[in-house]
Each structure stands twice: as structure tokens, then as C-alpha cells.
Amino acid sequence: LFALPGAFTPTCSSNHLPRYDELFEEFKSHGVDQIICLSVNDAFVMFQWSKHLGTKNIFMLPDGNGEFTRKMGMLVEKSNLGFGMRSWRYSMLVNDMVIEKMFVEPDFADNCPTDPFQSSDADTMMAFLKGSTSPGIAKPHAFVG
């Protein structure tokens, strides 16, 4: 599962979601059954975003009221960007309902002036599964929102 601040936002759309979709077969070859994208958005927005990006392998999980995100301790205020309450970026490897590994972006805070994206990416999770270190974030895709 990976969580991100919002559908149709630049980093989420140009890199975070597309890269997990690109690497799906490789994740599968390392024993991952399903990749889930979670965002504090409603189901209609998540559906249209997935359709717009053409994702094929990602289960889109809306957390419309932020309940799951709040219980994970990852709900942050992003009113400085006009977003309201959103999820902080993180990814986690879950095996039989047990979190085995979690990558949380640095500088966790309400109204964070930046949008850190250096550890919840698909390449970092893949490197963890391979028992190596991440080569870094993949280049973003073009995104027209």
C-alpha cells in the first residue's frame, strides 16, 4: 500500500502512482499480490484519476473521510495549499495484515511547506524487496492535469 496527498496532483500523477503501476509485474515476481493506492479523496475522484492515467494494476482505495489515514497517524493539515486534511506520503509492505516495513517521508508536519518524495516511491520499496538500496526516484512522466 502506498498513500499520497491527492489525486490529480503533480508528483502523485507524474511519478508516485505511475511508477508503482509500471513495476507491477516485478513486484508480483517478488511475492506482492496487490498494490493499493490510498488517498483522502472520494471514490469518484479516484476512479476518474485512475482512468485518466490509464493505470491497469493498482487497486485505488479512497479514504474519503480520512478515517483510515487518521488511525494510521498519517492525517495532516494541508490548508496552506488549499487541500484541507490529507494523507502524508508513505508506503508499507503488509503481509497477512501485519505491517512488515513502512517508509514514511521526512518532515511530517501540518502545513509542511514542501512535499517530500524520497522514500515512499516504488523504487525504494522494490529495493527493499530485493534486499538492496534504492537507486533513487525514477524520472517523472509528463502530466497534464
Protein language model features and the residues they cover:
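Chalcogenol-based redox active-site neighborhoods
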Residues: L1-G145
